[in-house]
Amino acid sequence: MKKIMRGVLLFGMLGGMLLSCGNNKSNDSQEPKKDSKVNEKVYKIGLSQIVDHPALNAAKQGFKDALEKAGVKADYDDKIANNDMSNQTLIMKQFAADKKDLVFAITTPTAQAAKNQIGKETPVIFGSVTDPKSAGLVGIPNVTGTSGAAPITENLKLMRELLPEAKKIGIIYNSSEQNSVSEVNNLKKLAGEHGFTVVEKAVTNGTEMVAAANLISKDIDIYYAIQDNTVASYFAAILDVFNNAKVPVLATNDVYSNAGGLISQGTTDYNIGYRSGEIAAEILLKGKKPNEIPIETVKNLQIEINKQNMQLLGIKIPDSILKQAKMVETKKN
């Protein structure tokens, strides 16, 4: 009888241990499921830009990379307006109807459309905007972002160092782009301090670009490529004009030097987009309001020199510039 009782007790103890182990395994397997629910929300984010262009695509990639690094899970709705403001307005109206959690607007016209169409309850983050104040983007409760304001003073100094005898700077811009108008006005204000005069040509669409380039190429010493969406879209065509006229191109963005322009100095669009993404993460994950985050001007200037164009034009770059520059070669699209 004692042997039987011992057997029953032993069986009971073993059974209890097995049940205990089984419960632990069950709890362990359920634990990750509890953790996985933390931050598992997928945010609906609308992305838009006025045109499809490498510089703007770089800003978009920087934005996504910053959100990914911050741990934001996102369902992106990526729309391009094809340089048509009526399309841009419709895109923003659709984002509003879809009740996006956040909208990222790349370039000034896109940001202006977002400001006008997106409800005040939805955060709007912009990037690659030259002059947020002139664009009417300052003081809007649900709007903030990053400015890629061109370093005009620094670029005028670079022009003078590169071409000591130069007198006339040529510039082409789309008069309907507020960011471009602002940049041209600032250039004209500052050029005289560095011994330059500005030869400007305004266009209303891309079909006028080559004719404008042919016209001013006869009367300038250097062409200044600014952050204008029309210039960016037709840069390859006008670069041919300036190369044939032996007019060097200095640009505000590395996308121009990568595309064959002689030299660029500015902040990369990728860095601008990345900082915009960091701001978006603060809003989505930490609950910050856009009006609690000041608009930032991203300034991390880089000089790039296109080796092929330098050889084509036969220009000798001073050592003072070379030692702080990165040499690049033309990237084929």
Where are these regions (language model features)?
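Extracytoplasmic "Venus flytrap"
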Residues: 40-64, 70, 77-86, 176, ...
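Short beta-strand elements at the ligand-binding edges of bilobed clamshell
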Residues: 135-160, 259-274
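Pocket-lining segment of extracytoplasmic ligand-binding domains
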Residues: 178-254
